[in-house]
Amino acid sequence: ENLLAVPVIMGIKTRSETFAGAEYTYTIEGFIPEANKGIQCATSHHLGQSFTKMFDIKYNDENMQISHCYYNSWGFTTRSIGVMIQTHSDDQGLVIPPKVAPIHIVIIPIYTKNKDRVCKFCLDLQKELSLKYVVKVDFTENRPGYKYNYWELRGVPLRIEIGEKEIDNKMYTIVRRDTGEKIKISD
């Protein structure tokens, strides 16, 4: 819920749905509001001591008494990623929540001349932002519109557009991937 920004429903499975051999099973169901459906994303099975007694697995407790271990089994599945994609993505591609995004910010240099000046500024900004975020500067020779689309498709949470005009005016455009909102900020 906190990492993938997906609504979840947590609970205990019914006896008939409990993992074979388990005393009880907890579940986390990812909820997809648009589809009004839940998909199992994670489970935790409390297996008690049945398996450890069967295989004679023991340990010394804090009083140095020999006891059988309690055992559990759990899993967080790749279905969780599917729920995140279905919940957040749109017609432009992925929308990845910042806490799990492999790249948090992409900087797009825009220039017709003074390429070196713009690129140096972008590198300096990347260095500063990289203290807290994972930042990429797109130095490909593609046009800005192509770059915008490329990174939107991949779900990078924030895009910063930097050109000569922005450097001169000390005003920069930040674009949020989740809402498409363009925010002007000053240096």
Regions found by a protein language model. Give the residues of each.
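NTP/phosphate- and nucleic-acid-binding module
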Residues: E1-D187
